[in-house]
Protein backbone atom coordinates (compact mmCIF):
# COMPACT_ATOMS: atom_id res chain seq x y z
CA UNK A 1 0.00 0.00 0.00
CA UNK A 2 2.90 2.36 0.78
CA UNK A 3 4.36 1.79 -2.66
CA UNK A 4 1.01 2.47 -4.30
CA UNK A 5 0.57 5.79 -2.42
CA UNK A 6 4.16 6.80 -3.23
CA UNK A 7 3.56 5.96 -6.89
CA UNK A 8 0.41 8.12 -6.98
CA UNK A 9 2.24 11.00 -5.27
CA UNK A 10 5.12 10.66 -7.73
CA UNK A 11 2.73 10.81 -10.72
CA UNK A 12 0.88 13.82 -9.27
CA UNK A 13 4.15 15.71 -8.75
CA UNK A 14 5.28 14.76 -12.24
CA UNK A 15 2.09 16.00 -13.97
CA UNK A 16 1.77 19.14 -11.84
CA UNK A 17 5.36 20.13 -12.61
CA UNK A 18 4.52 20.38 -16.33
CA UNK A 19 1.54 22.67 -15.74
CA UNK A 20 3.46 25.57 -14.23
CA UNK A 21 2.69 28.16 -16.91
CA UNK A 22 0.92 31.21 -15.58
CA UNK A 23 -2.19 32.58 -17.21
CA UNK A 24 -0.21 35.43 -18.80
CA UNK A 25 2.10 32.91 -20.49
CA UNK A 26 -0.80 30.86 -21.87
CA UNK A 27 -2.72 33.82 -23.33
CA UNK A 28 -1.07 35.12 -26.47
CA UNK A 29 -1.74 36.83 -29.78
CA UNK A 30 -2.09 34.61 -32.85
CA UNK A 31 1.16 33.52 -34.49
CA UNK A 32 0.19 34.83 -37.95
CA UNK A 33 -3.00 36.40 -39.32
CA UNK A 34 -3.71 37.29 -42.95
CA UNK A 35 -6.86 39.32 -43.57
CA UNK A 36 -8.61 41.72 -45.90
CA UNK A 37 -10.58 44.66 -44.52
CA UNK A 38 -12.87 47.28 -45.95
CA UNK A 39 -14.48 50.33 -44.45
CA UNK A 40 -15.73 53.82 -45.08
CA UNK A 41 -12.17 55.10 -45.51
CA UNK A 42 -10.75 52.43 -47.85
CA UNK A 43 -9.74 48.80 -48.48
CA UNK A 44 -6.68 47.01 -47.06
CA UNK A 45 -4.84 43.68 -47.12
CA UNK A 46 -2.86 43.07 -43.93
CA UNK A 47 -0.73 40.54 -42.11
CA UNK A 48 -0.10 40.41 -38.35
CA UNK A 49 2.92 38.55 -37.04
CA UNK A 50 3.41 37.61 -33.38
CA UNK A 51 6.45 39.24 -31.77
CA UNK A 52 5.71 38.31 -28.15
CA UNK A 53 2.69 37.20 -26.08
CA UNK A 54 0.91 40.57 -26.32
CA UNK A 55 2.86 42.23 -29.15
CA UNK A 56 2.27 41.88 -32.89
CA UNK A 57 3.66 43.58 -35.99
CA UNK A 58 1.10 44.49 -38.63
CA UNK A 59 2.10 45.14 -42.24
CA UNK A 60 -0.55 46.43 -44.55
CA UNK A 61 -1.16 47.77 -48.06
CA UNK A 62 -4.33 49.46 -49.17
CA UNK A 63 -6.10 52.41 -50.68
CA UNK A 64 -7.71 54.93 -48.38
CA UNK A 65 -9.16 58.39 -48.03
CA UNK A 66 -7.53 60.64 -45.50
CA UNK A 67 -8.66 63.90 -43.91
CA UNK A 68 -5.82 66.39 -43.68
CA UNK A 69 -5.64 69.45 -41.44
CA UNK A 70 -2.78 71.94 -41.60
CA UNK A 71 -1.37 73.09 -38.25
CA UNK A 72 -2.30 76.78 -38.67
CA UNK A 73 -5.14 76.36 -41.15
CA UNK A 74 -8.62 74.92 -41.26
CA UNK A 75 -9.80 71.86 -43.20
CA UNK A 76 -7.44 71.25 -46.12
CA UNK A 77 -8.57 68.29 -48.21
CA UNK A 78 -9.89 64.75 -48.48
CA UNK A 79 -7.46 62.61 -50.49
CA UNK A 80 -7.45 59.09 -51.89
CA UNK A 81 -4.07 57.37 -51.74
CA UNK A 82 -2.35 53.99 -51.82
CA UNK A 83 -0.45 53.37 -48.58
CA UNK A 84 1.92 50.86 -47.03
CA UNK A 85 1.67 50.61 -43.23
CA UNK A 86 4.03 49.19 -40.64
CA UNK A 87 2.35 49.09 -37.24
CA UNK A 88 3.61 47.50 -34.02
CA UNK A 89 0.63 46.71 -31.76
CA UNK A 90 0.33 46.05 -28.04
CA UNK A 91 -2.83 44.11 -27.11
CA UNK A 92 -3.23 45.18 -23.49
CA UNK A 93 -6.39 43.35 -22.40
CA UNK A 94 -5.95 39.82 -23.76
CA UNK A 95 -5.55 38.29 -20.28
CA UNK A 96 -8.58 40.15 -18.92
CA UNK A 97 -10.76 39.05 -21.86
CA UNK A 98 -9.56 35.44 -21.51
CA UNK A 99 -10.28 35.43 -17.76
CA UNK A 100 -13.86 36.54 -18.51
CA UNK A 101 -14.14 33.74 -21.12
CA UNK A 102 -14.51 36.21 -23.99
CA UNK A 103 -13.39 35.37 -27.51
CA UNK A 104 -9.77 36.39 -28.23
CA UNK A 105 -9.37 34.40 -31.45
CA UNK A 106 -7.70 36.40 -34.26
CA UNK A 107 -6.46 38.97 -31.71
CA UNK A 108 -9.93 40.20 -30.70
CA UNK A 109 -8.90 42.70 -28.02
CA UNK A 110 -8.12 46.35 -27.33
CA UNK A 111 -4.76 47.64 -28.52
CA UNK A 112 -2.50 50.65 -28.78
CA UNK A 113 -0.11 51.04 -31.67
CA UNK A 114 2.32 53.37 -33.38
CA UNK A 115 1.50 53.64 -37.08
CA UNK A 116 4.01 54.53 -39.72
CA UNK A 117 3.17 54.61 -43.38
CA UNK A 118 4.44 55.56 -46.79
CA UNK A 119 2.09 56.63 -49.56
CA UNK A 120 2.99 55.09 -52.91
CA UNK A 121 0.64 56.98 -55.21
CA UNK A 122 -0.83 60.27 -54.18
CA UNK A 123 -1.14 63.58 -55.95
CA UNK A 124 1.33 62.89 -58.77
CA UNK A 125 0.52 66.14 -60.62
CA UNK A 126 1.92 68.19 -57.74
CA UNK A 127 4.64 65.68 -56.90
CA UNK A 128 3.36 65.23 -53.35
CA UNK A 129 4.65 62.26 -51.39
CA UNK A 130 3.61 61.88 -47.75
CA UNK A 131 5.61 60.01 -45.14
CA UNK A 132 3.68 59.64 -41.90
CA UNK A 133 5.35 59.09 -38.57
CA UNK A 134 4.40 59.24 -34.91
CA UNK A 135 0.74 58.36 -35.17
CA UNK A 136 -0.27 56.79 -31.86
CA UNK A 137 -3.50 54.83 -32.32
CA UNK A 138 -6.04 53.27 -29.96
CA UNK A 139 -8.30 50.56 -31.33
CA UNK A 140 -10.54 47.60 -30.63
CA UNK A 141 -11.10 44.45 -32.67
CA UNK A 142 -14.05 42.13 -32.10
CA UNK A 143 -15.07 38.91 -33.85
CA UNK A 144 -18.48 38.70 -35.47
CA UNK A 145 -18.06 35.05 -36.55
CA UNK A 146 -15.02 32.77 -36.74
CA UNK A 147 -13.72 34.51 -39.89
CA UNK A 148 -15.39 37.97 -39.85
CA UNK A 149 -14.35 40.79 -37.54
CA UNK A 150 -14.96 44.46 -36.84
CA UNK A 151 -12.17 46.91 -36.03
CA UNK A 152 -12.49 50.50 -34.78
CA UNK A 153 -9.49 52.76 -34.21
CA UNK A 154 -8.54 56.40 -33.88
CA UNK A 155 -5.19 58.13 -34.02
CA UNK A 156 -3.93 61.68 -34.33
CA UNK A 157 -0.46 62.07 -35.74
CA UNK A 158 2.10 64.12 -37.58
CA UNK A 159 2.81 63.82 -41.31
CA UNK A 160 5.55 65.29 -43.44
CA UNK A 161 4.97 66.32 -47.06
CA UNK A 162 7.14 68.54 -49.24
CA UNK A 163 8.72 70.23 -46.20
CA UNK A 164 5.31 70.90 -44.62
CA UNK A 165 4.36 69.34 -41.29
CA UNK A 166 0.65 68.72 -40.77
CA UNK A 167 -1.54 67.10 -38.14
CA UNK A 168 -3.89 64.34 -39.25
CA UNK A 169 -6.87 62.67 -37.66
CA UNK A 170 -6.88 58.99 -38.58
CA UNK A 171 -10.26 57.44 -37.73
CA UNK A 172 -10.91 53.93 -38.97
CA UNK A 173 -14.01 51.72 -39.09
CA UNK A 174 -13.21 48.37 -40.72
CA UNK A 175 -15.08 45.18 -41.46
CA UNK A 176 -12.76 42.27 -42.26
CA UNK A 177 -12.36 38.65 -43.27
CA UNK A 178 -9.55 36.52 -41.80
CA UNK A 179 -8.17 33.76 -44.05
Which ranges hold each PLM region?
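Bacterial Sec-dependent N-terminal signal peptides
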Residues: 1-27, 175-179
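Short loop/turn motifs that connect adjacent beta-strands in outer-membrane beta-barrel proteins
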Residues: 21-31, 54, 93-109, 144-148
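Start-of-domain marker
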Residues: 24-68, 73-77
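Residues that define the transmembrane beta-barrel architecture of outer-membrane proteins
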Residues: 28-34, 39-43, 78-84, 128-134, ...
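Transmembrane beta-strands of outer-membrane beta-barrel proteins
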Residues: 32-36, 57-61, 84, 108-116, ...
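Transmembrane beta-strands of outer-membrane beta-barrel pores
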Residues: 38-42, 61-67, 90-92, 116-122, ...
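Outer-membrane beta-barrel strand-turn architecture
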Residues: 49-53, 92-94, 120, 142-146, ...
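Outer-membrane beta-barrel "beta-signal"
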Residues: 82-98, 167-179
